[in-house]
């Protein structure tokens, strides 16, 4: 039997490519540490597993593992103190991730927000990140509260728990567009573009918000401007199914053949995702595209490469749209709103 060596286990999974293979290796390390009753290393491994799921997976594993992490770190007051910083960051990741899973009841989401707020205040941190993440949740359920939280986010002091200038400007773009303040949104967006600010998701998300707003307003000139960089930024990215879906919406209106090619190129990402929020937005765009293509008599291919006739495309579009309706009903039931249904 292989001797338990936590440092070697961590070294081994850090050497792997980020994604599913690394996540499997971290789960193996978690099991080994728990079997050895090694609480400090089990806590570290749980942290790494949650981080990997949030930033290189579909966030599904993070939501499963987070309660286990909390139970473990709270067994020992010394461990709880030692891991406070990591725990605060995980709360921040989890309250945002929970927005994307209708399976997490609203009561549980609100409880996590309450716990996160308490920990921030008890340890002298700003509520800026809390307001930002709660505004995201309320953007799908309570627009008035979203607006208030957005204002509080802008007014709260910055501190070390912030996501950095690029991400915070990106949030300003998002929420300013949500409340119809396009001037403020463009001021923030231009800072990102002019200064070439970058994160793993910025400016991809920024272009996505701008494209979505342009399509809602019927401004196809602006939409064409934003879709060009967005297409290359989101293509093949498992995190960006929402943005890919928005590109498909654009292609459904402008270039069906290009849209079919883009859809076929990225549909494997959709099939491999366990994130219902991302799947909803991808499916919404796919259904619009395939419906329009079928109406124009175009054919396509499925994920196996089999050619689909216009009639088969139409049937596939209806199947996808029915899945969208189901997801919309489930999110709206959890959120107690009609946001997702209204987006169909």
Language-model features, listed with the residues they occupy:
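C-terminal non-catalytic interaction modules
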Residues: 268-344
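Solenoid-like repeat scaffolds
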Residues: 30-39, 70-79, 116-125, 151-164, ...
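Residue-level recognition of tetratricopeptide repeat
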Residues: 51, 136, 174, 212, ...
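Generic helix N-cap/helix-start motif at coil->alpha-helix transitions
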Residues: 1-10, 21-22, 42-44, 87-91, ...
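Long, repeat-rich segments with strong aromatic
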Residues: 184, 208-217, 221-225, 233-260, ...
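Helix-turn-helix repeat elements of alpha-solenoid scaffolds
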Residues: 15-28, 58-74, 101-115, 138-152, ...
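Non-membrane alpha-helical segments in proteins
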Residues: 7-15, 28-31, 40-58, 85-99, ...
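Alpha-solenoid helical repeat scaffolds
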Residues: 105, 124-128, 132, 142-186, ...
């Amino acid at each position: 039997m292989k001797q338990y060596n936590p440092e070697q286990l961590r070294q081994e999974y850090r050497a792997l490519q980020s994604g599913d293979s690394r996540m499997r290796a971290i789960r193996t390390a978690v099991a080994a540490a728990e079997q050895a009753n090694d609480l400090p290393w089990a806590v570290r491994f749980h942290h790494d597993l949650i981080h990997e799921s949030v930033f290189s997976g579909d966030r599904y594993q993070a939501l499963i593992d987070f309660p286990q992490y909390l139970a473990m770190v709270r067994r020992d007051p010394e461990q709880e103190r030692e891991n406070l910083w990591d725990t605060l960051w995980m709360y921040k990741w989890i309250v945002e991730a929970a927005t994307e899973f209708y399976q997490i009841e609203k009561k549980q989401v609100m409880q996590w927000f309450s716990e996160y707020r308490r920990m921030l205040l008890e340890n002298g941190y700003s509520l800026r990140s809390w307001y930002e993440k709660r505004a995201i949740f309320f953007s799908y359920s309570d627009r008035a509260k979203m607006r208030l939280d957005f204002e509080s986010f802008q007014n709260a002091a910055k501190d070390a728990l912030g996501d950095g200038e690029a991400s915070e400007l990106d949030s300003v773009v998002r929420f300013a567009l949500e409340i119809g303040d396009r001037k403020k949104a463009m001021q923030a967006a231009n800072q990102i573009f002019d200064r070439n600010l970058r994160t793993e998701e910025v400016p991809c998300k920024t272009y996505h918000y701008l494209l979505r707003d342009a399509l809602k307003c019927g401004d196809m000139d602006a939409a064409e401007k934003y879709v060009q960089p967005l297409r290359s930024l989101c293509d093949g990215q498992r995190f960006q199914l929402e943005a890919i879906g928005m590109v498909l919406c654009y292609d459904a209106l402008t270039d069906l053949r290009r849209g079919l090619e883009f859809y076929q190129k990225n549909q494997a990402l959709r099939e491999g995702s366990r994130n219902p929020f991302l799947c909803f937005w991808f499916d919404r765009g796919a259904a619009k595209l395939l419906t329009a293509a079928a109406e124009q008599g175009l054919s396509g291919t499925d994920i196996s490469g089999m050619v689909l006739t216009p009639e088969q495309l139409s049937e596939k579009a209806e199947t996808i749209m029915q899945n969208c309706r189901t997801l919309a009903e489930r999110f709206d039931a959890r959120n107690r709103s009609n946001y997702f249904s209204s987006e169909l």
